[in-house]
Amino acid sequence: AHAIKEPLTERNICYYNKTRKRINKYWNDKKKNDKDLFIPADEENDKTQDMYIYEGLPVIAMKTKHDGDNILFANSETFNVGNIDNEYISLCCERPDENGEKEMYIYDCLIEDFRDYFLLNYCSTTHKSQGETITEEYTIYDWDGMTTKIKYTALSRAVKYENVYFGYGERE
């Protein structure tokens, strides 16, 4: 494992929401273009933040949405932004089919609904990352604020220990 000061990996896990927002802002600002769609934070919801939307942007659902018996997306499900037009933001992920094989799933979200359901996901809290397996390099922030059980959750997402970095977070 390695200790770093500047954000280095595009996948990150933290304990505090303040850290999550800071790391998400860092990567969103670094990757955005002037022409990208801007969606402001929802002042009524402190989990949200200003977002620039572009192809490839990682996002995470903050609640589940149903269409009858179908789950359109589940709380904590992760997506990448695909196509963006004047009305919709297309979100893509892989889901298991009835045989357990991975298949592409696409959800078209109305632009005006986007901030009600999705957050930036360059960084997610340990709570949101439970059950995930991370194959690429990632950084853990707020280590000192985590209990032993939460540290285990953050560390055990890794396929191999060499992929884990430790970043300097902020106390809330």
Annotate each PLM feature:
Residues 1-8:
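Conserved interdomain hinge at the start of the Helicase C-terminal
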Residues 11-172:
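Core RecA-like ATPase module of SF1/SF2 helicases and allied nucleic-acid translocases
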